[in-house]
Amino acid sequence: YYKISAIWGGHEGSLLLWVVILGGWIYAVAVKSRNLPQDIVARVLSVMGIVAVGFILFTLLTSSPFERHLPMYPQEGGDLNPLLQDIGLIIHPPMLYMGYVGFAVAFAFAIAALLSGQLDAAWARWSRPWTNVAWAFLTLGIALGSWWAYYELGWGGWWFWDPVENASFMPWLVGTALIHSLAVTEKRGVFKSWTVLLAIFTFSLSLLGTFLVRSGVLTSVHAFASDPERGYFILALLAITIGGSLLLYAIKAAHVKAESSFELVSRESFLLLNNIVLVVVALMVLLGTLYPLLLDALQMGKISVGAPYFNAMFIPLMSLLVVLMGIGAIARWKATKSEFLIKQLWLPGVLAVVVGVL
């Protein structure tokens, strides 16, 4: 089975895996969306097709896995890196890529909604199942990667805040915000513009993760297949995707109809705060990951941002998120009386403080 998994152990093969998985997602959307309006399906498939064309061109022009090296080839063949001769290589990258590429579906539905001007609950209902599946695959991929790193010598335990780990964690954070926001948009018709923006950012961070992993611009214990020159192509694709999407968003989002109203103390408010915290955490991780690269590019020296920074920022923000989750689960839609929340939360709050102190 290493003969198969070795395909994505190198740069060219990993891009081929990306393209194949994207083709699988496109096929699944085409088959499962026959009951949706055909104009929407056409736009969704067109957007995904454009993304596929970009990666296919990248693969063929700079990273063709079909290049022949005859007659200059190793007599006994090229061995797979010993660290990669593990069952983790078989299951971890495909699951991770299923999540990365799967967010292209939510991105495509968001762009299709912007193009059609139909930013309503319908597009959220159509894209939410795909987003949930992509998020589940990415979660599984990250968990498998942590399990692999835990027992692999020299990889810093189950989580090291390594740049490549961060590259997969950022779309997971924003993707988590996205699946919650899609649920609210579908049920209550609110957060329409915000949800589209999250869909754009989630897929953009997936592309950024690919750039960080495959370009070699960041030092990582996971760096097995990197090429800075090829990274520029992915960076250009990333710039076109983000720039074009945000330009379309700026033009179309201003025409979105007024959303349903909700009070300051309501489930919608707590879910929005939940989203904001997750996005702030993702930005914090992005800053810690790219800051050394920025300083190096400006010739201001070389530094490394390690676990102390991430832990100092991550722990208080995620603690706040846990509190918001607890309150939001009890709060009611549209409006919630403060007295009701106090009555429901005072006992669990006291118990939580006591257990925390002990």
Where are the model-predicted features located?
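Membrane-interfacial loop-to-helix junctions in multi-pass inner-membrane proteins
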Residues: 28-52, 115-136, 161, 184-200, ...
